[in-house]
């Protein structure tokens, strides 16, 4: 059958992409359809056609999948965030387990590896400790706060995201009322005019400390003291309170949310939080895992896989603000962390001091440059190497150096099981064996899943 653009087709959704689009086939031709899940029988309009695959828009669901549920969020379809919210949570976890397993086999050539069920959450809502709300104006001139629709910069009004903290709505309502009362305009990215661009809210789930950071296209907000008073007058359940109110200055014509300069209006330039027994100091620009409940599970698995006895030297690559490094340092002889972002390393050093940890040392730079240089010039040693790279995975130069260093164990923490599988294939081809694999659901209702892998050196001494 010839597939024609703008024609409607009936198809059975058989699979999902990592981005959460359903995959159906018309005589073998794959059509990706948003807002569908496996088992749905749908009518879809073909909107964009390539040689071997195309995209369709959901017109109607003829017969819903047994795994389809009513999304709790009223804007789930329009918002670009929770692509899997119409799928039962149990099925989401199975989809993610299958995704990991399939990538290991298809990309890594690693068949026969047991992939156990993904570790999910008892309550997969209200789990995010950070939210960034763009601020704009609707067609009627009203201030709107919410999230961008998928692949656009069109704001979907939503001040109470169900995967975010329940404190967000009250804070946003107060800021919006303040803006209206004082005739403060929201930012327009087309004309580069207006003042308020974003509102960033961070919460320490264990400490109850809250940070409110208003991102502005200017140097100050009119009547800042009044805004501070209004925010501090808010009350929150479970003894949570605002510990930091800041402005972040971003005058650039850019899609980057935060500028480099912050100014404190109240409290400290940071909040604090714990993962396990380790305390972390978090600033507006700090990278910090957004799901603290699952992060603790993830790090405990990584720590278990590392098999530390107190005598090991560990290298933690792509260490960020030292979140995993400091977990490891409590059980290791020495930990070296490497991270490309200077500010993150400053946070890592601060966090080490905050916890009285003196056996962690940090380097600024690319992991694929620092580790080979240290190995070639100083012949550094590693009993265990932990890697937690970005989605693109590890550079081959880094993997090559890791193999040369021949640690007993490699613990690979991945946010993309496709690049994970590619890198594991290299390591398996160079003397390492995959011993354990575990998925952890850090981003409930999205297509993303974190995976932890233990590899052991099989080469003879």
Residue spans for each PLM region:
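Short edge beta-strands and adjacent turn/loop segments
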Residues: 193-206
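Rossmann-like S-adenosyl-L-methionine
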Residues: 2-7, 18, 222-461
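Extended interfacial segments that mediate partner engagement and assembly in macromolecular machines
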Residues: 59-71, 77-186, 206, 221
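Conserved loop-to-beta-strand segment in the C-terminal subdomain of adenylate-forming
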Residues: 53, 207-211, 447
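Short, aliphatic-rich beta-strand segments
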Residues: 201, 208-217, 279-283, 384
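Short, solvent-exposed loop/turn elements at beta->coil junctions and helix N-caps
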Residues: 116-124, 189, 198, 439-442
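Short, acidic/hydrophobic/Gly-rich beta-strand patch recurrent on exposed beta strands
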Residues: 22-27, 146-149, 213-215, 348
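Terminal RNA-binding accessory module
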Residues: 1-75, 361, 368-369
